[in-house]
Amino acid sequence: MIEAYETDVFMDPIGMKVWEKRHQYVATKLSALNCKRVLDMGTNTCKLIQRLSRSLQFTQIDGLDIDGQLLETQGIQNAKPDLIQNQYASMRDHQLVVNLYQGSALNKIQHLKDQQYDAVILVELIEHLQVEDVFLIEQNLFGFLRPQFVIVTTPNSDFNVYFNFKEQGVLFRDKDHKFEWSQNQFQIWAQKVCQNYGYKVIELTGVGEHKTEGTKNGFCTQIVVFEKDTQQEKYLNFAFFNLQEGEIRQVCQILYPFESKEQHFQREVVDSIRYILHITDKQNQFEDGSYQNYTTLSRIMQNHSISSNWQIQGDYFKLKTYIQNISEFLVHENQFNFQESFVTLNYQAQMEDEENEDQLESDSENVKMQQQQYYFSNDNCFSTKDTTYSSFSTADNLFSQKIQLGQQQMALEEIELEDTIDY
């Protein structure tokens, strides 16, 4: 409803829309609070998860929504790694797991409580509930799940004067909204939550300023950030909570590509030595047509990134040990060899006879297998294909589908989701 007014109403020098501002605020705040495990209640099309996944701090991002079909289509599409995420793999040194669940935010679900989230986020969700259901989501969120932090965003009805709703006979910004709070109503609700559940407000703010009048009528979207107050918690009694037990269906689990510190280090070693060998002028030529580039340990030690970043200044034994440890990895069908004080890169001659061609093909397959072992950190997370999508079931029928996403080798290809996806 408000999209038609964005150009005329909102002030933003770089042209960000209000929903983008909300996501930007949430991502920035979660980063400042050092949250690693978060739940997005009412995740919808998973646009917020897409934004959060670009941060390297998170280890788990879960999304919950009542609309399973939406999660299976747009949700999965937005939550899976894109080209940016695959480029991030070399910077992400821990696994990021994204889980999408179909279920109600009004029911208590032990599986979600067991995740021990650092933060739970409600972005433009609460206004879609019936007024009587607000109390239920309060109980579930602040009484049952009890994360350390809670972020809630909702429309500010005071700001609606700029939308000319009366002339159009419109009451709320969206036809599915059951109510919209004024700034005063929102603050009163936040205060009651703190009193009833042992939380405190650490920030009350918003996003979306009017183009000419600024925050005269507040922000377009109002935001509150709660933090659990451990001093009050021991005096609270949650026995009166009568939430119904609920069930959830896990729509998918997505494992983001990452590179452990050891893998990252080994790759840097290989890349640095290959570069040094590539630019060296020293070369041996053999009768069979093969040739060999080589360099000395002292030449490698002179490389600034090796001596500084690897903390091995002058320690030739340590450098030799590193090189020996990585000598098993083959790169571009050529092998590193370590002999005495020299490091060499061997290039095989062109093979003409059929026997040698078969041997070369076999060697090439071995090379590919070893490269896969090097670049893919976990067989359960990665495969030689970009994506494998399969359906399965368990005894408790909790898990229905699973996505295993691997690191891309070239560029992403556009695909359509089917029962089985392989690309």
From Swiss-Prot:
Localization in the cell: Nucleus
S-S bridge residues: none
Coiled-coil segments: none
Residues given in the record as S-adenosyl-L-methionine binding sites: 65, 104
Gene Ontology MF terms in the entry: metal ion binding; O-methyltransferase activity; RNA binding; RNA methyltransferase activity; small RNA 2'-O-methyltransferase activity
Cofactor binding: number and manner: Binds 1 Mg(2+) ion per subunit.
Reaction it catalyzes: small RNA 3'-end nucleotide + S-adenosyl-L-methionine = small RNA 3'-end 2'-O-methylnucleotide + S-adenosyl-L-homocysteine + H(+)
Binding site for Mg(2+): 124, 127-128, 177
Cofactor requirement: Mg(2+)
First-tier enzyme category under EC: transferase
InterPro entries referenced in this protein's UniProt entry, alphabetically: Hen1 (IPR026610), SAM-dependent_MTases_sf (IPR029063)
Signal peptide: none
Gene3D superfamilies for this protein: Vaccinia Virus protein VP39 (3.40.50.150)
Any single biological process term in GO: siRNA processing
Effect of disrupting the coding gene: Defects in programmed DNA elimination, and inefficient production of sexual progeny due to reduction in the level and length of piRNAs.
The EC number(s) this enzyme carries: 2.1.1.386
Keywords: Magnesium, Metal-binding, Methyltransferase, Nucleus, RNA-binding, RNA-mediated gene silencing, S-adenosyl-L-methionine, Transferase
A single GO cellular-component term on record: macronucleus
Job description of the protein: Methyltransferase that adds a 2'-O-methyl group at the 3'-end of piRNAs, a class of 24 to 30 nucleotide RNAs that are generated by a Dicer-independent mechanism and are primarily derived from transposons and other repeated sequence elements. This probably protects the 3'-end of piRNAs from uridylation activity and subsequent degradation. Required for programmed DNA elimination.
PANTHER family from the UniProt entry: HEN1, SMALL RNA 2'-O-METHYLTRANSFERASE
Family: Belongs to the methyltransferase superfamily. HEN1 family.
Protein name in the entry: Small RNA 2'-O-methyltransferase
Top-level taxonomy: Eukaryota, Sar, Alveolata, Ciliophora, Intramacronucleata
